[in-house]
Amino acid sequence: MYILVWKEGQQIKTFQDLEECGQFQIASNITDGQIFSVSVTPTMSKGGETGETQLRRLMYLSASTEPEKCNAEYLADMAHVATLRNKQIGVSGFLLYSSPFFFQVIEGTDEDLDFLFAKISSDPRHERCIVLANGPCTGRMYGEWHMKDSHIDNITKHPAIKTILFQIARSFSSMWSYLPKNAANMLLLGKNPNKQAPEPMSVVVTFIYLVEFSSILAHPGLTEQCADILAAFVDACVRNVEGTGGQVAKFITGICMAYWPINRAEDALVGLQQLSEDLAELRSQQPPGSALSLIYSRCGVHYGRALLCNAGFRKADFTLLGDCINTASRITSLSVKLKVPLLLSFEVRCLLGDEMREELESAGLHKVKGRDKPVQVYQFNAPELDSAVVRTKIEQFNPGRYRALCPVKPYDSLHPAQRPPIFDDTPRDSQPKVNQMQRRDSLVDRLSMIAKLAFPSSMMVGGESQLITLTYISQAAHPMSRLDLSSIQRVSFSRNESSNITGSLLYVNGLFVQTLEGPKSAVVSLYLKIRQDKRHKDVVAVFMAPIEERVYGSPLDMTAATEEMLATFPPLQDVLSQLAKSFISLETYVPSTVVRYLTAGNNPRNLQPVSVEVVMLATDICSFTPLSERCSLTEVWTICNTFIDACTSAICNEGGEVIKLIGDCVTAYFPPTAADNAVHACQEIVSFCAQLRDAFRDVLDCRSVVACGVGLDFGQVIMAQCGSLGMTEFVVAGEVSARVMEVEALTREAGRAIVITEPVADRLSPKLRDTGIVPCQEGVDGVPCYGILGVEWELDVAIIKKNIYGFHEARAQAALKKVDDGTNAPGRGAPAAGVPSSPKARALGRTSSVSSYTPDLNETLDPRMAESVFNDLCNQRGDAPNNSIAAKLRQAANDDRLDLGRMLQGPHELMPVLQAIKQLTNLRMLNMSDNFVDDNNVGELAESCIPMRSLQVLDLSNNPGLTKVIALKRLIKHNTQIREILLNGTRIAPMEQRKLQSSMNVNRMCASTDSKSSHKYDH
């Protein structure tokens, strides 16, 4: 249990989990709150009484490669060998088999488990080992078993247990390839991706464009081959990005976003060049009529600070956020104008070695969208890549009689039972729409309004009396006693009997597993009620299908897995509980279409590529670049997370499907007959932003200036899954995908928050079409556009930018005021005239020149005060102190080294850090690499380093904002002990760097001469 205390203990609220507590704190803007964890440690199971420490427990799932052999004798032989081996290395655990899956838990030390799991993973008797849990444990739960084995048939004949084990394991294994790589890596480490805190990191980011893909989509003769083109593009990107140490973040309609760590910049460029060569080789090998001969790529590369985080709640994306992501996208767009296949920023050039730098050619300074300052870019000496030439080649292309490997078929031409479930046909209660002024929902309520139910179209063709089965899992909102379970059984038995429903309900350690059988209308109605039942949370359907006859004869077969089954095999509840929790986590990252197809009992690899007409939606935050430039990375994550949750809520409530979450941008689609629903979703999104601004109007919160624009367009898209190298993407691509982004951008010029194209307007209801839209002066690609009429739907970009700059200025003034208030508080004497104030009272910014530096005789510097100074300055700014930095400062008080490389989350933390390290007069080495140091604040850094009379090494590497050396020259002049200043990855000219080193060498020689002279006089 977690307790949130705020207003100096006057208000207290309890929560069941930390995530719920954090959401409430953020939504309520509680800045002075403290979270306390209250828990009771249970007694260790038998085997944990030995006093062993540093133990770890690992649970994994795998699929048998020879399920026909896996009987009780086979498992017994396997367990006998494992027991002998595990006994020697001190590993305990159990093995459970439920055809065709193995579930195994092993316990031991880190070294033993790493060795054993490496051998297990390479065992040919199973495949696809997926870690379900991996973490430290206080003792052994299965200490008496070096390897306990059991076949599910030896534990129970209960069909519910077998059903849930098979269905969840099958779905879990199938969804694995659709996961973002970062989320998959988290799971392999035994971590829940949607529980991970945002992690700041320095990355080399690229956007890889499939050149003129929109022209390919617009070519009527190439529609059938689009799936083949996307599959080849995905495989080529994955192979070259991951082969050079990078990670693919996501695919976005013919665009690949990828990143590399800071030390793999050269590898990144090599991989991107190899990608271009691979596609050239692929083009040369194609027969006449193959559209693969039209694949070209272009890339833009940038380096900067980003936040690796989980964005979104109900539909999530584990991705990168930050200003450098937007800049990388702009550089790729600039490469189209410059006609080059690979373009990189100056920041990336700074990370390269001398040999690769010599291969680069300057492409000049260019203004890009969203940035006030021009960007310096570079290119390799490579053949020109002109999009106009590629477009002409595509337009003149004749596929002839060539047939695609994965042909795309029209959606309407398929039999209803064969159509993939690309639309959410969930029955919804009709609720009256209310306008913005009538809404009184809290922020938490608005973020949680998400309805999702997986009904495949194959089940919609049957009548209401069709016999179906539905299995779902959920977590109990609170622990269930025997009395609670008896009450549920009594009420449910009578209700199910009257509705002609049979089934079973299994309760396992806080987890409900229920199977319902009966007429479709009755089962659907009951399931909808269960989703609203406050005794459940995280309700997810795992299997649905028509059936010929019932499996269960009773209206409710109630089973608590704490009785006879667990007496036979107690670890069963651990397997079920962990498997269900992992499935719930995965479901948020996988496309809804794939989840619905899986839930119906199908293999997602059999999804038919289709072409279909849809209403496409795109939305993003207005003026996000100026808003995010002066916000911390955590604040950027908060803004995006709040906005994404609101968008997914509104879209799903209106029957839409979220396609991609791209930073602050959300794309989605609606059925062609749901234009009104799409407009209503747009109105909900815009209304939410207005409510957000009102909610935080009186506080300096970054969400108080959030506004958005939304665009709607209509057209044909292709839906297909692509990829075969361990990563699968469900792609929604079409000419309308690119055009809708232009429609959304038109909202700024039109002054309307919602802009729709004429094809969408033609599909609106007469009332909305005739009275609710107004023509825009401009269109997109010759298509007329309309804005939604109403004062609440107006958008003034000038006012939005004014509010953003005003917010940044107000926050800066508030920070200065807090500093002044802290200095002149009652009980403190005001500083005498001409005497500088303490570091805490100094305004955050450069206040004096290093050239005229004189020690302040009234200033006491104490290394033990560094952490306190940092925390105080952060609190005065209204920011939460970075615990990692505070710990480093605390450690440096008793050490002569301080390594803060890549530790800062944003420029807002730099000034408190500089004031704090001034206290550390004992330092010999200071690492400030990759920490937002630039020409505007290097003077403050130099002033902080002057009192460090023992300082010998200062590392300022990978700070591309550094271009001038005047402050560093003054530092060397006043602190002659400095022997080395590392400036790799900065924009300081090599000649200036050599001059600095010469000055330090002179200081060293002078010090040596003084030392020798004093030695002679001493004699």
Swiss-Prot record:
| Assembly mode | Heterotetramer of two alpha and two beta subunits.
Query: Which family does the similarity line name?
Result: Belongs to the adenylyl cyclase class-4/guanylyl cyclase family.
Its localization reads: Cell projection, Cilium, Flagellum
Cofactor(s) needed, names only, are: FAD
Q: Which domain of life is it from?
A: Eukaryota
| GO MF annotation list | adenylate cyclase activity; ATP binding; blue light photoreceptor activity; FAD binding; photoreceptor activity
Q: List, alphabetically, the GO terms of the cellular component aspect.
A: motile cilium
InterPro entries recorded: A/G_cyclase, Acylphosphatase-like_dom_sf, Adenylyl/Guanylyl_Cyclase_3/4, BLUF_domain, LRR_dom_sf, Nucleotide_cyclase
Q: What name goes with this protein? A: Photoactivated adenylate cyclase subunit alpha
- Return the EC number: 4.6.1.1
Species for this entry = Euglena longa
The record ties this protein, via SMART domains, to:
BLUF
Task: Give the main location.
Answer: other
Q: Per the record, which residues fall in region Disordered?
A: 822-859
The residue ranges flagged as biased composition, category Low complexity, are 822-839
Q: What is this enzyme's catalytic activity, as reactions? A: ATP = 3',5'-cyclic AMP + diphosphate
Q: Where is the composition biased (Polar residues)?
A: 846-857
Keyword annotations of the record: ATP-binding, cAMP biosynthesis, Cell projection, Chromophore, Cilium, FAD, Flagellum, Flavoprotein, Lyase, Nucleotide-binding, Photoreceptor protein, Receptor, Repeat, Sensory transduction
Query: Mind telling me which Pfam families this protein's record contains?
Result: BLUF, Guanylate_cyc
Q: What does this protein do?
A: Acts as a photoreceptor for the step-up photophobic response.
List residues of the BLUF domain: 55-148, 467-559
Broad enzyme group: lyase
> Which GO BP annotation is one of this protein's?
cAMP biosynthetic process
Annotated Guanylate cyclase domain ranges read 204-332, 615-744
